[in-house]
């Protein structure tokens, strides 16, 4: 019997896709200008490759990506420049963050029947600032437990530790909880590795090259579809 649901926040309950896109574009343009790049096509190839490498290593600190990029070109723009660029990046994200249209209604309905938990990743970088949005506070009030993984000695998702910690916080077992997230590697593979049933949200409003669902977990494109899943019946 399911007694609890646990969610990721960014791109699961809160949508800041346009902010991430605008923040990336702003960073790319300013790096190109500051580094005196003329071959922008090759630069963008390097930019994407470095970003992918860091994300796969669960390093979401944009400054680390930019430092590697500038080193590749033999440049050093200085900490002040990168700090300012990171501030601008995360401000785009904060300004864009809005709960998905159906999110609050779904959370309120679920709260009547289940315990609710949130697990959000941070790498002690600016990514925590994505949670400074009023929309995060608006959602947080409905949850019984909230874990910021990647801080205070708590490993970041997909490590099983934050998932196991949430089970303890909510007083449930692996068989009594469902985890909902959007990132296949971080959320779905992470929860699955912790022995937790999971649901993959591929929200209809988010344009992304989704990976293959190799685990065969249930998929939804709207949070309202949670109530229709056999897992909750």
Language-model features, listed with the residues they occupy:
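N-terminal helical cap/lid subdomain that shapes the substrate entry/recognition surface
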Residues: 2-101, 125
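Asp-based, Mg2+/Mn2+-dependent phosphohydrolase catalytic module
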Residues: 1-5, 15-18, 104-108, 114-233
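A broad, low-specificity signal for short, low-complexity segments enriched in glycine/proline
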Residues: 28, 76-81, 110, 138-139, ...
